[in-house]
């Protein structure tokens, strides 16, 4: 896999069931969740020792943004570390609630929709060169992203006036534009707001907001890995057929509602194509591209899972990937439960099952239970995730940020940090600007730490 700075931002759903008479609003529950963070960070928007950012987003949604990663397994470990960091906050908040006489269980969900129909996102970030034609890259990537849900969707039981049906994606029905500078109002596929968090003369950040939040480590590997490969092909000028859809927003919904992948979707230039055929062509192009430029173990793993997932959809024999792809894992679970208990998809217990798959609490969330029983495949170990909770990626700028935050906290020093700045809030107001996200060592940061 080409070395590239990548990151994942995840907004979590939160709710609380109360045991006593007193009730709290979602806003109040979220504030309890972040009380420990505010006590040491004096804010609900902080950077952690592992280089990540943790904050309370609009609408009472806790959000975790991984540190800059340049390898997929490291990114997956840091994405999973975010779940555990927030789960630790949940345990702390439940203890505080109990101490104050407000008995309650807090539920944190790594999903994309709530029961009221609200949607919250999972955003992928890829660093690209400033010199490239952004519009060309975005236009080339959108058809891939529209069809990618076939291999990387989280799955959802969609309730409608016509009944209930199983869909590929949680996010698809909440996307309203192809490209836009807004993320909450219009919910585009690619966000065009130009915030590189790096040297603006050299870099730009590609901000993809169409993807689902994945519980499965292997699905995250496939989701991000395939996007990185297609992006690399576009940047390298690999000729690809024009799959621009006549209406990308209608296309993303039609594809989500068809688990066979065979729904023909209209193309802007005339004719049509199915998600299965489009993804198969992307896969074949990527396999040829990698064969020509050379492979590595991670790229091989991505291509192998991509091929096997497409074969599973083609044959509708999902046993080849039913521990590796979120929407398939969940569908197998729901189908088995519904058949055992004689339920249809409209039954409330099916909705509960759908939601509980995304509960991040170990031993309660269904995905974590499946993983513990070997029925959900892994990419990284529990030890790697535990390490990622406190140790930043060692080959990117995140290492400098994480080491600075740790040193300042240990020394009891007042400091300010963002993605590119490290600042000691003392009389000298010493500040270091880190414009190169690939750089993991810097004498200026070493001196700043030594001066504490």
Swiss-Prot record:
It holds the Pfam family Pup_ligase. InterPro entries: Pup_ligase, Pup_ligase/deamidase. It catalyses: ATP + [prokaryotic ubiquitin-like protein]-L-glutamate + [protein]-L-lysine = ADP + phosphate + N(6)-([prokaryotic ubiquitin-like protein]-gamma-L-glutamyl)-[protein]-L-lysine. Transmembrane segments: none annotated. Pathway: Protein degradation; proteasomal Pup-dependent pathway; Protein modification; protein pupylation. GO terms for molecular function: ATP binding; ligase activity, forming carbon-nitrogen bonds; magnesium ion binding; ubiquitin-like protein transferase activity. Keywords: ATP-binding, Ligase, Magnesium, Metal-binding, Nucleotide-binding, Ubl conjugation pathway. ATP binds at residues 53, 66, 419. The active site is at residue 57. One of its GO terms (biological process) is protein pupylation. Its EC number is 6.3.1.19. Mg(2+) binds at residues 9, 55, 63. Belongs to the Pup ligase/Pup deamidase family. Pup-conjugating enzyme subfamily. The reaction mechanism probably proceeds via the activation of Pup by phosphorylation of its C-terminal glutamate, which is then subject to nucleophilic attack by the substrate lysine, resulting in an isopeptide bond and the release of phosphate as a good leaving group. Catalyzes the covalent attachment of the prokaryotic ubiquitin-like protein modifier Pup to the proteasomal substrate proteins, thereby targeting them for proteasomal degradation. This tagging system is termed pupylation. The ligation reaction involves the side-chain carboxylate of the C-terminal glutamate of Pup and the side-chain amino group of a substrate lysine. NCBIfam families: pupylate_PafA. This is Pup--protein ligase. The lineage of its organism: Bacteria, Bacillati, Actinomycetota, Actinomycetes, Nakamurellales.
């Amino acid at each position: 896999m080409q070395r590239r700075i990548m990151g994942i931002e995840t907004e979590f759903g939160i709710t609380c069931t109360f045991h006593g008479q007193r009730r709290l609003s979602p806003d109040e529950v979220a504030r309890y969740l972040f009380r420990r963070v505010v006590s040491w960070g004096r804010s609900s928007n902080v950077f952690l020792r592992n280089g990540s950012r943790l904050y309370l987003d609009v609408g009472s949604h806790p959000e975790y943004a991984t540190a800059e990663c340049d390898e997929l397994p490291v990114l997956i470990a840091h994405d999973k570390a975010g779940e555990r960091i927030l789960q630790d906050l949940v345990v702390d908040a439940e203890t505080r609630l109990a101490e104050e006489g407000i008995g309650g269980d807090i539920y944190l969900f790594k999903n994309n929709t709530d029961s009221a129909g609200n949607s919250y996102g999972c955003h992928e970030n890829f660093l690209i060169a400033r010199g490239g034609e952004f519009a060309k890259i975005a236009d080339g990537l959108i058809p891939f992203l529209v069809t990618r849900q076939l291999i990387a969707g989280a799955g959802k039981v969609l309730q409608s006036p016509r009944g209930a049906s199983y869909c590929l994606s949680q996010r698809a029905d909440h996307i309203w534009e192809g490209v836009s500078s807004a993320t909450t109002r219009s919910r585009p596929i690619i966000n065009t707001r130009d915030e590189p968090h790096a040297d603006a003369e050299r870099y730009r950040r590609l901000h993809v907001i169409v993807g689902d939040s994945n519980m499965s480590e292997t699905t995250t590997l496939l989701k991000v890995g395939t996007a990185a490969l297609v992006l690399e092909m576009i940047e390298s000028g690999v000729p690809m057929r024009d799959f621009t859809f006549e209406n990308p927003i209608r296309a993303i919904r039609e594809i989500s509602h068809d688990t066979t992948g065979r729904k023909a979707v209209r193309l802007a230039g005339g004719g049509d194509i199915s998600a299965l055929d489009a993804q198969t062509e992307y896969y074949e192009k990527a396999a040829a591209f990698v064969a020509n430029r050379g492979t590595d173990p991670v790229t091989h793993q991505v291509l192998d899972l991509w091929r096997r997932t497409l074969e599973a959809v083609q044959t509708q024999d999902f046993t080849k990937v039913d521990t590796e792809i979120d929407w398939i894992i969940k569908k197998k679970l729901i189908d088995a439960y519904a058949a055992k208990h004689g339920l249809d998809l409209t039954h409330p217990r099916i909705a509960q099952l759908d939601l509980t798959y995304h509960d991040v609490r170990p031993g309660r969330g269904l995905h974590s239970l499946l993983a513990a029983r070997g029925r959900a495949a892994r990419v990284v170990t529990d030890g790697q995730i535990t390490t990622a909770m406190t140790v930043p990626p060692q080959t990117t700028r995140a290492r400098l940020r994480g080491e600075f935050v740790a040193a300042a906290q240990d020394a009891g020093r007042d400091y300010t940090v963002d993605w590119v700045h490290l600042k000691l809030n003392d009389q000298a107001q010493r500040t270091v600007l880190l414009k190169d996200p690939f750089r993991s060592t810097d004498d200026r940061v070493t001196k700043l730490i030594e001066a504490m």
